[in-house]
Amino acid sequence: RLAMKGYSITIFDSKKKLGGLNEYGIAAYKSLENFAERETKFVLSIGGIEHKLNSTLGKDITLEELQNDYDAVFLGLGLSGVNHLRLEGENSEAIDDAVNYIEDLRQSQNLADLPVGRKVVVIGGGMTAIDMAVQIKKLGSEEVTIVYRRGQKDMSASIEEQQNAQNNGVLIRHWSKPSKLLINEKTVNGVEFEYTENKNGKLVATGEKFSIKADMVFRAIGQTFESSIDNLPKLENGRILVDNNYKTTVSGIWAGGDCVKDGEDLTVSAVEAGKIAANSIHNELVS
């Protein structure tokens, strides 16, 4: 939008390709071939847009440098961190993040190079958990189980997506939380779970446990905003605070998408935030 108004734009991206979640985070079974690449090529064809890849904010370039070199800065940082289960052995090779596997799959030139477990457990209740489970089932896993600590209606994944997973052979178990990774010499053999229940609005463990055998375990319990970058604008609830025009508390800096307070995990919402911020930037620069 700003390029169409005649501004010279520079995009910095930490990855080797543009496209963000559309390129790296959407399961392959949901995406058309090279759709993200085609979309970015269309945007770049507008003209006046330079892009610099493998450029990580806070490592390869600082926020202060961007402020000095450009009239306005828009931060679309997404959520690069992941939540952890806080279980013993979690930092070993026995468990992986679903987002990492989906990224590897999307960028793989040969699917035969990807590990595919025979029995797979996915821990979580959102769209990433569903995508991970359906994707690896389609790749050939014999048994895939999603385990979520609350009930079906509490899952952030829609009922339709849950049903789609089940139609693809994925088992979904509710009211269970992981209590122990079953590991033998860095090799995962399964996960021990404890049944949960809702008591007076609080999730409590019942003390009764069970185990699911698995040779691959994936974590899909949400992502977090990595806020270790120097001189970031003010945060609230762990994300960047913005006004209705997506302007931050720091003059000359706007932000949008998942990295801002109340940001939604939706591409269309991030695009809308970018449009609103672009108009705000233009209005401020011409005033």
Question: For the regions a protein language model found, what residue spans apply to each?
Answer:
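N-terminal Rossmann-like FAD-binding beta1-loop-alpha1 element of flavoenzymes
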Residues: 1-11, 128-137
